[in-house]
Amino acid sequence: MGDVSYIVDSLGLPPFSYQMSLLSFTEKGPQELLQLLSDVFSTISPKHQKVDVAKEVPDQTADRLIGFLKIIKYRPNVQDPLLFRQLVAAGDRETLYQILRWVVPQAQLLEKRAFVGYYLSFPDMPEEFNFDPDIMELKEEIKAMQQEFIELHKSSDAIKTLSKDTQALKNKIKSLEEEKERLGEKVERAKGAVDKLPDRSSYMEVCTNLRKQQDEEVNLSTAIQTQRALQEKAEASYHRAAARLRELQTSYQEGSAGKLLETLNEDVKNLRAQVNERYPKEVEKRQKRQAALSEALASGISTEMDLQRLQHQATALHNQITEIQERKVAQDKARQGDKAYLQLRQAQQMATVSARKKEELGAKQERLQEKKTALTAQLDKLNAEGGGSGAVFSEEEWRTKYESMKSKLPIYKKMKKELGDLEAEVFVLAHTEELLASQEGGLLEKVKRLEKQQGISGFTETAQHLEKVSEAKSQMDEEKGMTLIEISRTVEEINNAINQRKQQLAPQIKKLRSVRQDFAEFEAKYLEKKTAYDNVVATFEARTSALEGEVSGLKAEVSENETKYHMLHCQLHITDQNIKKVTSGPAAERLRDKYEAKVKEAEDSTKALRDRQREIKDTHSTGLSQIDIMNDMLRLLQLKLNLARGIAVDMSQYGGGGGAAGGANGGMAGQTYDTGSANVLQL
């Protein structure tokens, strides 16, 4: 569950910025998880285009995702590639969670790895083509170009790294040149001062000897420190060995094999605890430290810009950690009602407390062991100084000490008796005080009863209160009088001090006035210069920002053009290889024969079509005249048919040019018809 929460939190950060909750993420199905994984890959690498997984075959989706994972060098937990492919194609939740858990946190690193891996990977092809001579030659050329790409990419990164801190390097070079000039001036002045000395050679010889002696002194002090460290180490080992020897001698003198065995078992237990618990932790810490230092040294950080970039990254990571902690606290608050979660948190807290107590006890044990070793070493040292006999005090010293204690014994007894008398007196006084207090309480009760009988209850308390108030008032008045006297004395002292101080400060005040006038003039000049400086800085910053924007745009354009150049170069090379493949070899002969046959067949077809075209051109005019004759015949026959039926016909629809002319009575006789161009009898 922790990995899922971490994945959701990481997906909410740039460059992904997926706004989803833990519940919505866990409710996603296999297809939705595959779509999310594909979108994450497309965000990391623009070469991995966004694809709708629903419209894609599962095997094709699995091959595409696994191919990208190979490029970014992902190592699955499943050793069998076929099983891993099946799990990805099926959208197995655990497998996809592991991939997301590995990919999402290191998007920036994988982006660079995907860019480089895209150009360093070979295209997929069937196995039977791998041993083709042309394919093998092409692979060798691709390998050579990949090596060239690696070198160019490294040089490009180095140039980009150097170009980041150009201004910082310029400033550093300028400061070094100024420092060089100052040092040169100092050297020249020193040479001039030395040349003026009458016995310059003797001074030079003395200075040289002094420098040699100083270097020798430094070397000797270093050697002394080294020898002292070795001596302390040897003394510590000697004390440990002496303590061990003393323990063994004690065990041997006691004659108890069980005691000796118990001691050895305890030592073995302590050593085993150190080997199994303490030393692995220290080794792990040192390995992590060494790895961090190695990475820092390998990164080649040598400029202030790099340090600032790392500081910004550290700040961003701290902010992310803070956000994650706040989100975790919010989630913990939201889960307060979950009984199982509360039990789990309680168990985790108990385990944490137990581990902390265990570490504290281990540290305490180590401190006690070190203290024991130090005390043992001190005891051994005292024994060694005492001649190795094991006795700290001699017999004469014991006798002197005994006589001193014997002479002080009467004083001790006398003071002890006085202390007993004082304690008895204190006891009697305390008992008397208790009796008087009880009697006072009884008397106060009697007084209260009498006051109540007389109808003046509370009189005693009021009188006591008034007495206390009067005492407090008198005390306050006395304090007020003393305070007023003290205040008047203090005011007089302050006035005297002020007058005295005024006399002392009079010349300084006059000087201060002139200084204030000078300050006002300098402040006006400063404001004027500051305004001019601000204007210059604003202009410079505007120009700098414009140049930076232009530089970033040009860098982006250069990067895009480099990518296009590499892509077009690869395509051109592939096209050249295809042309070479087509124009040489047995395959080219077969293709040439095939296309020559097709060309010959096309020529024969063209010749036949041309003959057909010529034939059609020859018969075209004859066909048109026959069509006109047939049209005229049809009109003539239609006209004869109409005349036979006795129908007057407008000849214009048959191509005639005029109408019919008749007598006044009309009729068929004496009528004339315009028959157009047809050969028609006149009736």
Swiss-Prot record:
GO molecular function: tubulin binding
Domain of life per record: Eukaryota
Subcellular location: Cell projection, Cilium
Protein name listed in UniProt: Intraflagellar transport protein 81
Residue stretches in coiled coil: 134-387, 587-618
Entry's Gene Ontology cellular component terms: apical part of cell; intraciliary transport particle B; motile cilium
Function: Component of the intraflagellar transport (IFT) complex B: together with IFT74, forms a tubulin-binding module that specifically mediates transport of tubulin within the cilium. Binds tubulin via its CH (calponin-homology)-like region. Required for ciliogenesis.
Organism: Chlamydomonas reinhardtii
